[in-house]
C-alpha cells in the first residue's frame, strides 16, 4: 500500500497591524526573523520556511536589521526561505483592479533583489473572499496554483453531497476558473492554515495530535498528499520541529512525514490529482454558507479609510500615470522612483486588517498619515507633469488678443464632456517689487474687464465668471529661490465637450468678448432640468428623476435609512426585532443654493432624531465576548439629532445627478444607508469588481440565514430589466445591498459606527464609532439597457476622476493647441491604466472586457510607433501585434479578458 505523505510547511501569517499597533507587531517580527535565521543556521533538519507570500516582511525586518540582508539573501537563494509573490497580503475587494496588479508586480520586483527565487503560488490565506478574476491574474503572472482559506464551502467526500458546483467542492483541491476561462489549481485550507501548528515532541501528546489531525486532513484530500500548515497568526518559529517530525515518523510508520514547502507539495500533488476535480467559478465569497461570517461588512467599517484609498488610487491610476506617460513621450523622464514610493506607501494600507478598518484605533490613525503621504507624492507628480506638458503646447493662436489661455486635460481614458472651473491669474506682481500688503491694496483697485472664453478657431463659448479678487501664489524655480507674488484673478466656469481621452483642449479667456448665457437649470420649484434629465426634490428630500431619452421616471430615490448595529468592525448585526428608521415622509428643509446656466444645486437638510446608541446591554456583552450574532442588546430609547445636508447637483449636458452628503454623526452603534428603489424586475444585478462587472443574485442561497445580504462594489452597482437600468456610482463607498423587496432597491452604505474590533477577544475601538462630520459622494445614472450595453460604466468611471485644468502662457510649442496622444474605442471595453513599464521602458496600456463575449479594441496614435505587442499584467512581451502603418492596431478581446498593450516608441 502506498504511504500517505504529510507535507508540513512552516510559516507564520503576519498581519502587520491588527489588534496591536504596527510597531508592536514590528518588534515581534524582528524577534521572529532573528529566531528563524538562527534556526536555519543551527538546524539543517529545519528545511524551509514560507514567509507568508508577502515581500514587505523583508522590508520591515531590514529596516531595523540591515546587517542581516546578506544572510537573509543566502537562505532565500538556497530555497530555505520562500518569498513572494505579493508585496502585501491585500484585501482583494477593497483595493482596485490596478492595485491588485501592482501588488504582484512590486512583489516580484522586490523578490528579485534577493536572487529572484519567487514562490509561484497565488497565496490568499486569510482574504475575506476571493476575486473572480484571480485565476486570470495569476496565469498572467506565470502562476497556476492558488491557495486560499475562504470563499468555498468544503463538503468532504464522506460528509455531504455538493449541491452547487460553482461554490462547493468535496475536496480541498479543485479547479478555479475565472470569467475569461483561465484555470488554476485551487487549494483550500479546509482545516485552516494552522492545522499543523505546535507539533508535539512528547510521544503520548504526538499520538493524540496526529490521530486527530491526519483524519481531518484525509477527510478533504483528493490524494494521499496531506497538507499541514505549521504556523498561524504571528506564530513564533517552532524551533524543535525537526525533532517533532522524527517523533511522528517513529510513531506513524505508515505516513511519510516531510518538512515541505509549497513548491514540492504542489509538484507531488499534480502527479496524483484526480480527473474529476470540481470546478468552482468566479468570485468565491462564501455564497453557500449561513452568511454570518463572510466578513463583508468590513467594507463599511471606517468608511473614511475607503474613501481616502479610492481617492489615492484614482489619482495614481487615472491622473498621474497617464499624464506622466504622455509627458514621457514629450521628453520628460518618467518618475518610476516616485511612483514606486507612492504605490508602496499606499499599499502599506492595503492588508486586510488595515484597509478593512478592523483593527485597533492606533492602526487606523497611522493609515491616515500614509494615505496623505502617498497622495502628496502623487499630487507632486501631477503638478510636475502638467507643468512640463504646458510648456510644450503651442498657444500662439491666442497671441495679440489680450488672451489668458488655459488647458483642459482629460486623463480618464474616455472621451469626456462636462462642466469645468478654473481660476485664472490676469496679472502678477512679485514680492520683490514691493511689500505684499501694498501690492494687494493696489491690485484690488484694478477692475476686472468683462470677457468670455474662446476656442482656437475663434468661436466664443458660453461661460460664467466672477471676480476672484487678489490671491497669493508662488513659483518654485528649478534654479533659484522661491518667488512669491500676488495676482489679480477671475474664476471661470464653462461646459467643455469632446475632450479626447489622453489629450487636451486649450481655450482662452479674452476680455471684451461676450456671449449671451444659456437658460437656468432650475426650471420649477425645487426642480433641476437639462436636456437629458429632470430631477424634482420632494418634501422629504428624496428625488424623483426622469430620464428624458426613455421617458422613465424613478421616484423615492435617496431616502436615508438608519439601523442599529450591535455587531463589530467585521460584521453588521441589527438588534433582534428592530426595524430600520427612514427619512421617507420626514419633512426636510430645501433651498436652491446655486442657479446658473452651467450648474444648479438644491440643498436639503434633515434634522433626524435617532437613538443615541445601543443600550447598556451591548457593552456588557462585548466585555463578556458574547458572539455578535446571539447578542440580546437593543437600541437606546434616548434620541439625538442626526443632521444630514444633501446637495443635489445637475450640470448642463450631464447624464447623471451628483449627490454630496454631509453627516454630523452624534450617534453610536448604527448604520446609515441611501436607498434607490430601481423598480425593475430582475433576479440578478451587476456590480463592478476586480476587472469585471460581476453578476450576482439578488436573493442569496437557501443556506443563508443572515437577514442582510451585503456585498462589495467598486465604482458602481446597477439593476436592469434588460430594457432600462439604474446605476448608482460612488466614490469610496464599497458596501451595498440589493434589498429583497419588490422594488430591487439598491442600498448603499454611507456610514457605520461600531465600538469594538471583534473576532477573538475584547478590543474596544471608540474611534470606529465615527463620531463627527463625515461626507459621502455618489451619482445617480438612469439609462437604457444594462450598465455595460449602455456604456453607463464609462460615466461611472469618469465620475471618479477630477478634471485637470491649468493656465498656460501664450507661446510657441511642440504640440498643437488641441491634441490626443492616444485614441481608442471598444464597445463594452473599460480602460484600466496607461503607464511606462519599469523593465522595458515601453508604454503599456491596459483594458478589460466587461462583456462575456468577444469585443474589439482599436487603438491609434498620432505618430508611428516602432511596434505593438501583447503583454501580460507583469508587462512582459508576449507576442508582437501586426500594424500596417505602425499607428493603428486592432485586437479581439476574448470574454472578460484583461488585455495589456505594449507600445514601443
Locations of regions flagged by a protein language model:
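N-terminal catalytic cores of secreted or lumenal carbohydrate-active enzymes
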Residues: 1-98, 102-103, 110-114, 140, ...
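Catalytic grooves of carbohydrate-active enzymes
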Residues: 8-9, 13-19, 24, 179-394, ...
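Surface-exposed loop and adjacent secondary-structure segments within mature catalytic domains
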Residues: 70-80, 131-197
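CE4/NodB-like, metal-dependent polysaccharide N-deacetylase domain
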Residues: 101-140, 212-227
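C-terminal (or distal) subdomains of carbohydrate-active enzymes
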Residues: 134-139, 145-151, 172, 188, ...
Amino acid at each position: 500500500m502506498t504511504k500517505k505523505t504529510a507535507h508540513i510547511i512552516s510559516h507564520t501569517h503576519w498581519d502587520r497591524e491588527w489588534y496591536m499597533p504596527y510597531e508592536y507587531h514590528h518588534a515581534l517580527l524582528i524577534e521572529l526573523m532573528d529566531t528563524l535565521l538562527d534556526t536555519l543556521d543551527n538546524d539543517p533538519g529545519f528545511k524551509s520556511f514560507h514567509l507568508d507570500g508577502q515581500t514587505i516582511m523583508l522590508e520591515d525586518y531590514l529596516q531595523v536589521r540591515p546587517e542581516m540582508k546578506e544572510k537573509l539573501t543566502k537562505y532565500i537563494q538556497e530555497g530555505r526561505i520562500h518569498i513572494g509573490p505579493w508585496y502585501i497580503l491585500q484585501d482583494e475587494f477593497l483595493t482596485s483592479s490596478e492595485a491588485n496588479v501592482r501588488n504582484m508586480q512590486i512583489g516580484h520586483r522586490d523578490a528579485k533583489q534577493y536572487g529572484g527565487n519567487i514562490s509561484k503560488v497565488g497565496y490568499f490565506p486569510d482574504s475575506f473572499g476571493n476575486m473572480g478574476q484571480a485565476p486570470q491574474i495569476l496565469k498572467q503572472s506565470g502562476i497556476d496554483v492558488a491557495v486560499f482559506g475562504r470563499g468555498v464551502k468544503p463538503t468532504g467526500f464522506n460528509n455531504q453531497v455538493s449541491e452547487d458546483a460553482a461554490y462547493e467542492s468535496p475536496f480541498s483541491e479543485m479547479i478555479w476558473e475565472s470569467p475569461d476561462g483561465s484555470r488554476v489549481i485551487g487549494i483550500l485550507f479546509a482545516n485552516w492554515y494552522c492545522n499543523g501548528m505546535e507539533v508535539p515532541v512528547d510521544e503520548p501528546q504526538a499520538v493524540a495530535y496526529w490521530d486527530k489531525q491526519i483524519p481531518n486532513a484525509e477527510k478533504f484530500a483528493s490524494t494521499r498528499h496531506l497538507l499541514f500548515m505549521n504556523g498561524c497568526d504571528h506564530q513564533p518559529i517552532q524551533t524543535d520541529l525537526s525533532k517533532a517530525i522524527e517523533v511522528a515518523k517513529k510513531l506513524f510508520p505508515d505516513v511519510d512525514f516531510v518538512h515541505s514547502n509549497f513548491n514540492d507539495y504542489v509538484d507531488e500533488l499534480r502527479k496524483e490529482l484526480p480527473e474529476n476535480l470540481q470546478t468552482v467559478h468566479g468570485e468565491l465569497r462564501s455564497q453557500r454558507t449561513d452568511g454570518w461570517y463572510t466578513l463583508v461588512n468590513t467594507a463599511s467599517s471606517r468608511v473614511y479609510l475607503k474613501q481616502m484609498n479610492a481617492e489615492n488610487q484614482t489619482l495614481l491610476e487615472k491622473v498621474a500615470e497617464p499624464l506622466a506617460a504622455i509627458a514621457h513621450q514629450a521628453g520628460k523622464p518618467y518618475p518610476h522612483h516616485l511612483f514606486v514610493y507612492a504605490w508602496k506607501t499606499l499599499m502599506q494600507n492595503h492588508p486586510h486588517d488595515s484597509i478593512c478598518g478592523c483593527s485597533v484605533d492606533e492602526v487606523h490613525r497611522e493609515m491616515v498619515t500614509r494615505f496623505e503621504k502617498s497622495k502628496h507624492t502623487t499630487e507632486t507628480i501631477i503638478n510636475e507633469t502638467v507643468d512640463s506638458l504646458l510648456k510644450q503646447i503651442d498657444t500662439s493662436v491666442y497671441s495679440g488678443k489680450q488672451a489668458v489661455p488655459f488647458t483642459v486635460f482629460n486623463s480618464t481614458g474616455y472621451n469626456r464632456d462636462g462642466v469645468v472651473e478654473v481660476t485664472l491669474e490676469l496679472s502678477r506682481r512679485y514680492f520683490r517689487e514691493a511689500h505684499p500688503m501694498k501690492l494687494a491694496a493696489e491690485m484690488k483697485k484694478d477692475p476686472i474687464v468683462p470677457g468670455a472664453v474662446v476656442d482656437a478657431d475663434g468661436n466664443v463659448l458660453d461661460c460664467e465668471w466672477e471676480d476672484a479678487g487678489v490671491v497669493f501664489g508662488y513659483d518654485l524655480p528649478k534654479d533659484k529661490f522661491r518667488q512669491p507674488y500676488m495676482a489679480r484673478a477671475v474664476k471661470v466656469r464653462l461646459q467643455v465637450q469632446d475632450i479626447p481621452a489622453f489629450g487636451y483642449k486649450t481655450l482662452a479667456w479674452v476680455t471684451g468678448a461676450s456671449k449671451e448665457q444659456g437658460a437656468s437649470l432650475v426650471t420649477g420649484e425645487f426642480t433641476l432640468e437639462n436636456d437629458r434629465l429632470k430631477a424634482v426634490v420632494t418634501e422629504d428630500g428624496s428625488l424623483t428623476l426622469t430620464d428624458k431619452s426613455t421617458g422613465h421616471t424613478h421616484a423615492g430615490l435617496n431616502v436615508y435609512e438608519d439601523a442599529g448595529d450591535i455587531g463589530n468592525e467585521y460584521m453588521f448585526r441589527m438588534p433582534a426585532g428592530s426595524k430600520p428608521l427612514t427619512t421617507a415622509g420626514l419633512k426636510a428643509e430645501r433651498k436652491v443654493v446655486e442657479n446658473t446656466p452651467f450648474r444648479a444645486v438644491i440643498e436639503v437638510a434633515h434634522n433626524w432624531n435617532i437613538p443615541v446608541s445601543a443600550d447598556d446591554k451591548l457593552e456588557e456583552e462585548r466585555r463578556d465576548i458574547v458572539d455578535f450574532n446571539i447578542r440580546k442588546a437593543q437600541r437606546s430609547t434616548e434620541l439625538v439629532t442626526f443632521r444630514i445636508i444633501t446637495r443635489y447637483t445637475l450640470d448642463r449636458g450631464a447624464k447623471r445627478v451628483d449627490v454630496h452628503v454631509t453627516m454630523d454623526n452624534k450617534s453610536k452603534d448604527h448604520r446609515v444607508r441611501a436607498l434607490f428603489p430601481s423598480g425593475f424586475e430582475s433576479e440578478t444585478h451587476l456590480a463592478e469588481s476586480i476587472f469585471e462587472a460581476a453578476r450576482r443574485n439578488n436573493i442569496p442561497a437557501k443556506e443563508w440565514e443572515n437577514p442582510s445580504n451585503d456585498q462589495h462594489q467598486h465604482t458602481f452597482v446597477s439593476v436592469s430589466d434588460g430594457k432600462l437600468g439604474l446605476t448608482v456610482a460612488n466614490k469610496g463607498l464599497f458596501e451595498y445591498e440589493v434589498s429583497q423587496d419588490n422594488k430591487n432597491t439598491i442600498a448603499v452604505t454611507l456610514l457605520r459606527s461600531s465600538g469594538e474590533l471583534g473576532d477573538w477577544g475584547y478590543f474596544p475601538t471608540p474611534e470606529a464609532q465615527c463620531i463627527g462630520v463625515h461626507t459621502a459622494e455618489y451619482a445617480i445614472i438612469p439609462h437604457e439597457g444594462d450598465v455595460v450595453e449602455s456604456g453607463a460604466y464609462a460615466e461611472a468611471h469618469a465620475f471618479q476622476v477630477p478634471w485637470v485644468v491649468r493656465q498656460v502662457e501664450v507661446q510657441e510649442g511642440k504640440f498643437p493647441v488641441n491634441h490626443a496622444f492616444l485614441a481608442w474605442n471598444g464597445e463594452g471595453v473599460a480602460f484600466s491604466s496607461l503607464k511606462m513599464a519599469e523593465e522595458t521602458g515601453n508604454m503599456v496600456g491596459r483594458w478589460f472586457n466587461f462583456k462575456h463575449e468577444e469585443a474589439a479594441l482599436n487603438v491609434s496614435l498620432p505618430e508611428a510607433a516602432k511596434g505593438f505587442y501583447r503583454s501580460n499584467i507583469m508587462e512582459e512581451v508576449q507576442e508582437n501585434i501586426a500594424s500596417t502603418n505602425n499607428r493603428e492596431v486592432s485586437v479581439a478581446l476574448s470574454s472578460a479578458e484583461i488585455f495589456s498593450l505594449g507600445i514601443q516608441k
